[in-house]
Amino acid sequence: MDLKTAEGNPGVLSIIVLTYNRKRLLRGCLDSLFSQTAPRESLEILVVDDGSTDGTEEIIREISLRYPDLKYCRQAHKGIPVARNTGIANASGNIIAIVADDYLLAPDYAETITKFFRENPGAMVVRFKIIAAEDDFISRVSHFYLDVGVRRRLCCEEISEESWLKSLKKKWQKLPVVEEQITTQHDLEAAGGAAFKRGVFKTVGLFDESLLRAEDTDMTRRLRAQGILVYYYPYHQIRHRYGRSIFATVSQCFASGRNRWRYYNKYSNDSVDLFRLAGWRIKEKIGALLSAFWRARQAGSVREFLLYLPFMCLFETSTKLGFFWSALLSKKKGADSTGRS
């Protein structure tokens, strides 16, 4: 998939909206984008539909009556990385931002991006702070789980399998309060409504379409390998709408675990045998429990700790099970291939 031009149209910001079977959320996201304070001629809003079957196409036709400059690309259901790449290939701006359909963007989102790159001409990538859009319990507990991970990565705190049993005391401690400032000293992905200068994709390539969801982690790894910094800009907040049930978060955690395995498998040269898988199973269970306790420990009070702990255990267990399940399937697939040969 080739980019149209190396630089794109100067002065144009392309905002790609990724969607799949979430027409209700998409409508809210687009309403927020078409309420931007930036001049309309400086914006290109492009929806990439990853093969929705819920009537998304009809919603787009309806919205296009109000916003005729809305662009729409529909593809067969191939996953988020392919949708990202489809959007990039069809975008014309020299700056490309990618947002999810469950985001609500503040009116100055586009202006914040263009102003940031104007004031920081050497920057190539910037991401923003994600907050919960609603204050219901499901949104609070789901966001807490993700936000603790963000805070850890802002502190560059690693929670690796090797460190769990060696530094339990340290991992039980609460994370330090991180002063909110523009920084590149973090371990965050180029996600969170991130905006890229178009030339980035000429340098490091497009998103890896084999990873399904861990493509932003992989992209960030390739960016850093080329010396391209990811700026974190916490002064602009993007509101994230979480699912209506706790099971939506559980499902996302399981999918996240599965894709962690795919990412691990891409960069690991180790062969995986059944003995190691059995060992992983034990470590994953222990790790899920310890990580859940650690996340709940970041709560502001004993009451919140006790309230959040069961959900942290549920989310962490789902993530670890997803990782182990993908590892097991990979091993089985490898064994089947060997047997056929």
Set out the residue ranges of the language-model regions.
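Glycine-rich, basic loop-to-helix element that forms the pyrophosphate-binding segment
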Residues: 75-91, 112
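A recurrent flexible, glycine/aromatic-enriched loop bordering the glycosyltransferase active site
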Residues: 156-199, 212
